[in-house]
Amino acid sequence: MKGNLNKMKKKALNKLIKLLDLEALEENLYRGQSENIGGSRVFGGQVLGQALTAALRTVDKKRSAHSLHAYFLRPGDMGYPIIYDVERTRDGRSFTTRRVVAIQKGEPIFDMVVSFHKKEKGPSHQIDMEDIPGPEECVSELELKKQIAHKVPEKFRDFFTRERPIEIRNLPGEGMFEGPKKKPP
């Protein structure tokens, strides 16, 4: 059973990698396809992921995204490919900025600005992480979904409980849709 789950997870991951692998049309211009997830509209996370992939293809590999702002302007249509137009806004010594516009049928459907930064030493400001159980002690999102699948309309159950390329595990006591209420530190 576990080997079969690993095969399903690997298949889902390969499908995601293929979806994010854009076709280069010319410099700064890419085309992406869409995955049908049960409707006529494109999933927004797919558009964001493909836009980030397009931006990454124009940036030095030593830099990683550290800030991203995105706007969903119009719904994407499953029946058409998406064109990603990358504007090389700035290439500095430490920071790189890109703007990506996703286009369908000649209209922008999505606009994103992303900043990349090379790894540098500097001050770190963060709150110490709580002492929490490790992933192996937490229930997977898929297991939780299977427990409540009977509450989902039958026509959506297979989609709801399908294997995903990225595994999510909730902390004990946290539900899928809401966690425990905590006061900020």
Protein language model regions, located:
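Terminal targeting signals and extreme-terminal segments of soluble enzymes
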Residues: 2-185
